[in-house]
Each structure stands twice: as structure tokens, then as C-alpha cells.
Amino acid sequence: MIQPQTYLNVADNSGARKLMCIRVLGGGNRRYGFIGDKIIAVVKDATPNMAVKKSDVVEAVIVRTRKAVSRDSGMSIRFDDNAAVIINKDGNPRGTRVFGPVARELRDKNFTKIVSLAPEVL
């Protein structure tokens, strides 16, 4: 459950380390974002000499949340942290690697490139 002002870890090698959500996309006055939702975020912490700099405004997709997500089978899944992957306008990740597990719901929302880069899909 990601809302504006929420801090997220970055699960790729684009150069950013921490993001702060400033907007949840989809719908006029949407309050919360869940796994697979796009957000607008600002980079709060970044690695030096990389593509993404501190205070850059970026678009990202949520890949892990602490809030449990229930599935149609009745199973629910939750992660240890809130994490996102920075994407470009086409929806492709800006980094070349994805760290940590990602949820299967990303495949349903057509983020297949992120799913293929991830080491584990839960």
C-alpha cells in the first residue's frame, strides 16, 4: 500500500537507491498503489556517476510491498520491504538488472521485461 510520501527501495541497477512516491498513477484522485501500479517518484538517494541522479523525478513500477496481496487461489503474499523498478516512458526498465524477488502479478500487468530480468518470481 504505497501512497504519496512513502519511501521505497530501488530494485534495479539504474543508480538510484531510495525513492519517495509523489503520485500514484491511474485514476483521478487515487490514494494507494499496489504491486504492478505505476508511480511518479523523486530520487532521494543515488549512487554517484550513474544514469539517475538525486532529485530526479522518475516513473517507477511497484514490485514488492509490505502489505499482503491476496490472490484468487486464497493465498496471500507479502514481502519484507517496499520496492520499485524505475521505468522509461515505454514501460521498459532503465536498469539492466533487477534485484530480489518480484510478484507474479507483474506478468498480468504486462511488465514482462521486469519479470524476465528478476532472479525469482513469487
Curated annotation (Swiss-Prot):
SUPFAM superfamilies: Ribosomal protein L14
GO cellular component: cytosolic large ribosomal subunit
Keyword list, A-Z: Ribonucleoprotein, Ribosomal protein, RNA-binding, rRNA-binding
BP-aspect Gene Ontology terms: translation
Example GO molecular function: large ribosomal subunit rRNA binding
Keyword Signal attributed: no
Family matches, as Pfam families: Ribosomal_L14
CDD domains the UniProt entry points to: Ribosomal_uL14
Recorded superkingdom: Bacteria
Gene3D superfamilies in the record: Ribosomal protein L14
Function: Binds to 23S rRNA. Forms part of two intersubunit bridges in the 70S ribosome.
Complexes and interactors: Part of the 50S ribosomal subunit. Forms a cluster with proteins L3 and L19. In the 70S ribosome, L14 and L19 interact and together make contacts with the 16S rRNA in bridges B5 and B8.
Family: Belongs to the universal ribosomal protein uL14 family.
Name this protein carries in UniProt: Large ribosomal subunit protein uL14
Organism: Nostoc punctiforme (strain ATCC 29133 / PCC 73102)
Name of the gene: rplN
